[in-house]
Regions:
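Signature of dsDNA virion morphogenesis modules
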Residues: 1-180, 186, 192
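Charged/polar low-complexity intrinsically disordered segments, enriched in acidic residues
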Residues: 171-217
Length: 217
């Protein structure tokens, strides 16, 4: 079976720094249901329940998706002793990250940046198991994600929002991926349309043969 392509999404939903009896904590919500995001080539909405059967076996917590750095936390099967706790609810997904600020200077830097408001958003990397497209014939269709296959990584994000004013900050890779998604969906829709037309023609021909409209050779 072909490996599913991983995608990234970033949002400006609140991320917080808290000091508790258990130490320095980061909380946030990387995935929010029913929020429309403009990805350049199309709008995208993550539908309620898209996380119901998602694989959350091993999820890492990074800063700006930098995989060259050691993860600042990790959720392994979301066990109680994991340094990142994941919660799925009616709103989407929330996280609670326990940072080792005593032994990791990057964890200290992140905590300070979130506390000061220098880092204000969350991002996540995921694969898609189910999707529905609307208005594919338009210049700006909508994709509704109905099932997220797996989440492999969550990041604190410096540029959290894909607002129109920030479109130039998007990577070419991200825009190319969005364009390809639209083209693939349109191609699949056209193929289904052709197959439907052929099936209708076949049924009409069979009816004519049975009613004597066409003579068998």
């Amino acid at each position: 079976m072909a490996k599913k392509e991983l995608e990234r999404r970033s949002y400006a939903f609140e991320i917080r720094a808290e000091e508790t009896d258990q130490g320095k904590i980061i909380t946030g919500r990387p995935i929010v249901y029913n929020s429309r995001t403009d990805l350049g080539w199309f709008d995208e909405i993550i539908e309620s329940g898209a996380l119901d059967n998602t694989d959350l076996t091993d999820v890492r917590f990074l800063v700006n998706h930098d995989t060259s750095k050691i993860p600042l936390a990790r959720s392994r099967r979301n066990t109680p002793n994991s340094t990142m706790q994941l919660t799925t609810d009616a709103m989407g997904m929330a996280i609670r990250v326990s940072l080792d600020t005593e032994n990791n200077f990057e964890a200290r830097n992140l905590y300070s940046a979130v506390e000061r408001g220098d880092i204000t958003g969350m991002s996540f990397m995921f694969s898609i198991d189910g999707e529905e497209w609307e208005n594919l014939e338009s210049d700006h269709p909508t994709r509704r994600i109905t099932a997220i296959g797996t989440v492999v990584e969550v990041s604190a994000c410096t540029f959290p929002a894909y607002d129109a004013t920030e479109i130039n900050a998007r990577s070419k890779e991200a825009l190319d991926s969005a364009r390809l998604a639209v083209e693939t969906a349109r191609s699949a829709e056209n193929k289904r349309s052709v197959e439907t037309d052929l099936e209708v023609l076949r049924l009409k021909t069979m009816i004519k043969i049975k009613t004597g409209g066409i003579k068998n050779a």
